[in-house]
Amino acid sequence: MASIKGIVIPAAWDQNGKIITLAIATDDEQEYLIETRQIFTKLKSLLREEVVVTGTIRQTEKNKIIEVKSYSRRQ
């Protein structure tokens, strides 16, 4: 498990402009896509706020992805 700190940002939208994917943008300009759908709504309520998320990180050819196990607002 790894913890990352950053800001919750939108990462993709549907054809109507609705946010369908979130990411965490870190201080070192990395972006981690949020994989965990169950947490999507809760993290969406923290859009543009600083958080700490803990979970499993994996890398694809194009993206870093985190499966979030827990999160909290950054103090």
Which residues make up each language-model segment?
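Short, surface-exposed secondary-structure junctions/capping segments
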Residues: 22, 49-60
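Structural detector for short beta-strands of small beta-barrel domains
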Residues: 1-16, 48, 55
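Short aromatic-glycine-enriched beta-strand elements
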Residues: 14-24
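Short nucleic-acid-contacting surface segments enriched for D/E, G, S/T with interspersed K/R
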Residues: 38-54
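Acidic/polar residues in short coil/turn loops that connect beta-strands
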Residues: 26-28
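OB-fold/S1-family single-stranded nucleic acid-binding modules
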Residues: 58-75
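Domain-length accessory/inserted modules outside core catalytic folds
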Residues: 21-23, 41, 47, 70, ...
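A short macromolecule-binding patch
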Residues: 30-35
